Structures are given as C-alpha cells and as structure tokens.
Regions:
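HhH-family (HhH-GPD) DNA N-glycosylase catalytic core used in base-excision repair
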Residues: 1-248
C-alpha cells in the first residue's frame, strides 16, 4: 500500500471514530441501555437487523427495545419476548417474517439458558475473530435460525463481524469492548458494508466487490498494514468516507 493511501486511511479513521458517529449508526442502540448484559443483548439483536435503509430498520430495533422496556437481556432471558414476537408469517422487516425473528430469539434464549451469555458461549468455542464468527453462525444454524444469522462463513457475515467489532474493540467512543478479554482485536474481520467495499475499490485495496469471507479477509489484511494493532479502526475510515461521498 502506498504511503499516501496509508496516511489518508489513518486520517479518516481519526476523523470518523468519534462520538458524533453514533446518532446515525445502529451502534447507538447499545449505548441507549444500561448494564453490560443488556448492552450485549441489544447489540446482538440490533446487528441482526442492520441492513437496508436506516430509516426503515432503526424503528424495528427500537420496537424491540420498547417492547423490552429497555431491558432486552431480561426480555429474552425470561421469555417475555414471545408475546411481542409471535411465530407468524407476517412481515417483520423486509425478508424477515415474525416467525424468523421468533426462531432467532428462541435460539438466543436457549444460548443464554445454557451458557449464561453470548460472551460465555464464544469464550468456550473461540479465541480469534474468525473462530467467533464461525461459532456464532454454527450455533444459530443448529437451532434453525439461519434465515437471520448466516449458516456458515462462506459469505462475508457482515453483521456478525460488525457485532464482534462492537463487542471486542476497547478504548473507542463507539465500540464497547465488553469481550476484549476473550478475543484479540487484531484477529477481527472487516464488516463488508456497501460503502466500505465501494471506497476500498476506489482506493485500490480490493479488486472485487464479491461479498465473500475471502474478500473481507483481504481487506482486513490491507487494514493491518495501516493499523497493525487494531485493523478494524479502518472500518470507520472507509465507512465514513463512503457515507460522505453518497451525501454529496
């Protein structure tokens, strides 16, 4: 990577990884609730719904927080979610029916019952970013909830990678770092958002826009050249630049 490109990415990351990033980002929802377990549960369900138009999916995330009266962890753990998310064919959000969300949250409730938290599940099954992605995908596939969570790591698993960024990176005004003690942030995988891919192609960091795990890992390797200790800092640079370009 050329030095001027490396410097541009570093400068962009410093510009965009600030608290000002939060209001328009789905990461804001985990900051709106109290308690580590609640933040983790809110972050997971928010990440699952984070695709498409923010104007459309933000209200779907807020519906969950409102239904849970701000305590998403207890709402899931105690089974209270069942009265709000029935197992029906009615549309919840875009491709997801209420029944899809029902199976997702039922699987998550079972995980909490068995392991205590998703963090403890991941701790017992993974020590790197890609292992954590694989473990999360595998669990929900085995629980018949792969409509929402990818079945395996052949795809880029963008939303799972984003959730892991939120959970693992510490010292950030955006990311929580609640799992910093179980996963090394240097092993995290870049979430392949449309804006991120667009800017990576423009800067010559990628040659293909194929949303595969192989592409995500190639971009992560490029970010390791700029941020050897924290490659996903580059996510803020590319995502922020892409959003700004779109708004011009």
């Amino acid at each position: 990577m050329e030095q001027n490109t490396r410097q541009l990415i570093a400068d962009l990351a410093a510009r965009y990884e600030t608290a000002a990033f939060l209001p328009a980002d789905p990461s804001s929802f985990m900051h709106s609730v109290e308690g580590d377990a609640n933040k983790e549960a809110t972050a997971f369900l928010a990440s699952c719904l984070s695709y498409g138009s923010r104007k459309q999916f933000f209200p779907k995330i807020q519906f969950i927080i409102d239904a849970a009266q701000g305590d998403v962890d207890s709402w899931v753990r105690l089974g209270e979610w069942r009265k709000d998310i029935p197992d029906t064919a009615k549309c919840y959000y875009r491709l997801y029916k209420f029944g899809d969300m029902h199976r997702l949250i039922a699987a998550y409730e079972e995980m909490l019952r068995e392991y205590g938290s998703m963090k403890e599940y991941v701790r017992s099954h993974a020590s790197t970013g890609i292992e954590a992605v694989s473990a999360i995908c595998r669990y929900f596939a085995e629980q018949d909830a792969s409509t929402v969570v990818p079945r395996n790591t052949q795809s880029a698993c963008k939303r799972v990678c984003m959730f892991l960024r939120w959970m693992v990176r510490s010292g950030s005004p955006v990311d929580l770092g609640l799992w910093a003690d179980i996963i090394d942030r240097r092993t995290l995988i870049m979430p392949l958002d449309t804006h991120v891919v667009q800017e990576a192609l423009r800067l010559g960091l990628l040659k293909s826009r194929t949303a595969s795990m192989a592409t995500a890992r190639r971009l992560t390797d490029a970010m390791l050249e700029v941020f050897p200790d924290d490659p996903l800092r580059g996510d803020f640079a590319l995502f922020g630049l892409g959003v700004d370009e779109d708004s011009k």
